[in-house]
A protein has these predicted regions:
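Conserved helicase C-terminal RecA-like lobe
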Residues: 1-37, 325-326
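Short glycine-/polar-rich loops that comprise or flank the Walker A/P-loop
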Residues: 38-42, 356-359
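Acidic beta-strand-to-loop metal/phosphate-binding motif
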Residues: 43-47
Length: 519
């Protein structure tokens, strides 16, 4: 709104937030009050970047002060850093950056600070080894319990896992506001709306009007339970929540449309493994050196019965753009859904009452994709592009009957499953035979045994996974200041996630006997 618009609305009695000029007046008053307080001196500073690293311009008052006092020199943090000498801790850090400097020699003369310099020299010369068996028991315990999501953390980098879950170190929090818990909100809606729809006969029996009524009901319920004093929140927060609400309608509409064309039905939500209240027992790996227990929760489990066997698929809601990738699986990453699937195969009978056959895993995009298209795009082209965003990502049992039960048009024109049908009618995509899934289950089991052995042996190597040096997790790691990673120094090394074709992946599993892949 420009100023004329605001004046017109104000004349009509509509209350608006303060205008830009009004806010400027308040800021100037606050600024005047702050500048009038000092009695001896005044230091004015400003950030050059925000918490994400984006460049920031100084506030106008900085330029005003420079014009009022042209003889003042601008000091940068990197020039001199004399202010760091006013406190002992920062001064010692500065001395440690250049051994044998004047500052280093100064602190050498004092017995107390000399001991600190000795400790710094010892730490600088130390090499990252392994934890002793006694240290492992103190840090992790004889029986190590972890969630499935932590498995990916330890496979990404042993040292990062040790810092976060062994030492329980906490990174310095940036001065920024937390983003809204979009994933939690969408999980809540998907679970509760789907459960109510199933109680009313399934998505085929519930039209869109009734479906949207349920969505509204649970949005209001969520706002009342989780967003206290929602009506008193500022206008921007309410706007963002309304926009998220529109996303929720779009996501649930496409989930409903998929399940209307499927014989698989949701059978469990937030199904838990392990813990005191777990529906199913934790996945347990027992070895001579100790035990590893892995628990967690499955967002959704869908099932279909054939020949008295229950075919199950594990569904994970993702508000981001995560894709299932066999290259990651080979490295021990992205195995969370597979772990749950094979655990259900072994333990699911006690919960579902039938023999279990694994039917696959799927990431479901819990987001409303915004398309970037030309202004004169045709409705047909727009629909074709939107269909691409509905494709799930995952790995499915490649039996035609099972795929057709998942999506009735799977063998001719699949819309949701990660499948392709060529002009000759041949089916391809992210599929595997029952034998291949069996070998994959053995591979996941061996990975867990390897992780258990590494934990109990005290492995804390800095060995981050990456596709290239440019995307190494070290660039954004919370523990970089404690790690000092240097590729090739001692046991520090990058582990590259190399691309792999599906046929190569399955061949490696068959020829390697299920041994975890190393690089």
């Amino acid at each position: 709104l420009n100023e004329d618009d605001r004046q017109e609305l104000a004349l009509r009695g509509i209350e608006l937030a303060p205008s830009g000029m009004e806010r400027m007046g308040v800021e100037l008053q606050n600024l005047y009050a702050a500048l009038a307080q000092p009695t001896e001196g005044l230091t004015v500073s400003y950030p050059v970047t925000d918490v994400s690293g984006s460049e920031l311009r100084p506030a106008f008052v900085v330029e005003r002060l420079r014009k009022l006092f042209p003889d003042l020199q601008m000091e940068r943090e990197s020039s001199g850093k004399e202010y760091r000498l006013t406190a002992l801790g920062p001064a010692l850090e500065t001395a440690g950056q250049r051994r044998n400097s004047t500052l280093w020699q100064y602190f050498r003369q004092d017995p107390d600070t000399a001991r600190r310099l000795d400790a710094m020299e010892y730490a600088a010369a130390a090499r990252r080894g392994s934890l002793s068996p006694a240290a492992v028991r103190v840090v992790y315990g004889q029986r190590i319990s972890m969630t499935a999501s932590r498995l990916e953390r330890i496979r990404s980098c042993h040292f990062a896992y040790f810092m976060e879950y062994g030492l329980r170190a906490k990174p310095r929090e940036p001065a920024a506001f937390d983003a809204p818990q979009i994933g939690t909100f969408l999980h809540y809606l998907l679970e509760n709306v789907t459960r109510d729809v199933l109680a009313q006969g399934g998505f085929a029996a519930v039209d869109n009007d009734r479906l949207h009524g349920l969505v509204r009901q649970y949005i209001d319920q969520y706002a009342a339970q989780e967003l206290h004093n929602f009506q008193n929140r500022n206008a921007r927060f309410q706007y963002l929540f309304r926009r998220l609400r529109n996303t929720a309608y779009a996501v649930i509409d496409q989930v409903a449309e998929e399940l209307r064309h499927s014989d698989f039905i949701p059978m469990a939500f937030e199904l838990s493994f392990g813990g005191k209240n777990g529906t199913l027992p934790a996945v347990t790996i027992s070895q001579p050196d100790g035990e590893l227990r892995v628990g967690g929760k499955v967002d959704r489990v869908d099932g279909w019965i054939r020949d008295d066997k229950l075919y199950l698929r594990v569904v994970d809601y993702k508000s981001g753009k995560k894709k299932f990738d066999l290259a990651n699986v080979r490295m021990g990453l992205d195995i969370q859904m597979l772990l749950y699937l094979f655990a259900l195969q072994k333990e699911g009978k006690r919960y579902f009452g039938r023999e279990i056959e694994p039917a696959g895993v799927l990431y479901l995009p819990a987001r409303d994709e915004i398309l970037s298209m030309e202004r004169n795009v045709t409705p047909e082209a727009l629909e074709k592009e939107r269909e691409k965003t509905l494709k799930r990502s995952g790995l499915l049992l490649g039996e035609p009957q099972v795929l057709q039960a998942m999506e009735h048009e799977a063998l001719t024109e699949p819309h949701y499953l990660p499948l392709r049908v060529n002009r000759s009618g041949d089916l391809s995509g992210s599929i595997a035979s029952a034998a291949q899934l069996g070998r994959l289950g053995n591979y996941v089991d061996r990975l867990l045994r390897q992780i258990s052995a590494e934990l109990h042996s005290g492995n804390i190597d800095a060995d981050p996974c990456c596709h290239s040096e440019e995307d190494s997790q070290c660039r954004f790691c919370d523990w970089a200041s404690a790690c000092h990673f240097r590729d090739g120094q001692d046991r520090d090394h990058l582990r590259y996630i190399l691309p792999v074709k599906p046929e190569e992946f399955w061949q490696e599993l068959e020829e390697g006997g299920g041994e975890p892949w190393q690089n």
